[in-house]
Amino acid sequence: MIHDIGSVCTYCGVGCDITAQVENNKILKIYAQSDGYVSQGKLCIKGKLGFDFVDSPLRIRNTRIKKSFIETNFESMPRELKARSNTLVSLDEDWFEATHEFGTSVAAWKLSEIKSTYGRHSFCATGGARTSCESGFLLQKFTRETMDSPNIDNCARVCHAPSLNGMAATIGEGAATNPYDDIYKTEFMLVIGSNTTEAHPIVANRMIEASRNKTAELVVCDVRNIQLGKFATKQVVLPYEANLLFLNAIAYVILKEFLYNP
């Protein structure tokens, strides 16, 4: 029986609404509902066709434990875990295949041992930027409450911590302040350092539409001659690594000519 499952695309930060058509626990196709608020009924090629990995034979389907880990830690294992180790199945020269229950029990025991031996600061966790809010909440809760560790991080911090601080100081919030459809209400769009049609195609659709309809001017500044530049009112192809210099030049002119609101 074929049925639909609604979800959110995780390929980029746009967050398009998607619907997966599923039969016998396998995805047949992914599409956007015609009334989708974010997607507007359209998906990029990655959102629409990028799901083959779900059923890839290369995916690891069962719990695995390193043979070297068992050899190193077997003597210090609790008796109950030693007794259950006979359920391990040799997969190759490096790995055992284990039941999910045994794998989680071994992981819980080892984490508890590390915490009691080396203290709470011996543990840290790094989350992913493409996971759900619920899994992010669960990871930080596990780190702070179960492991009693303040060492929780996210892969997005490396590149977005500076922008978060800068945006918070400038506009009061380190995140987007407007919904995508506000693009249709704006008069001017400045794109710098973003290949929007490649990285965030569904947002680029709105920008192109607004530019074509002459409701907003579009200025594109990039070190590459990107596709979005074809739809721009003005395009500036910058020398490599000149983004910051260009922004400083704009700031200089604004200050010198008093083009800011006092």
How would you name each of these model-derived features?
Residues M1-E257:
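N-terminal export/assembly segments and adjacent metallocofactor-ligating motifs
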Residues F258-P262:
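Internal, active-site/partner-interface "lid" segment
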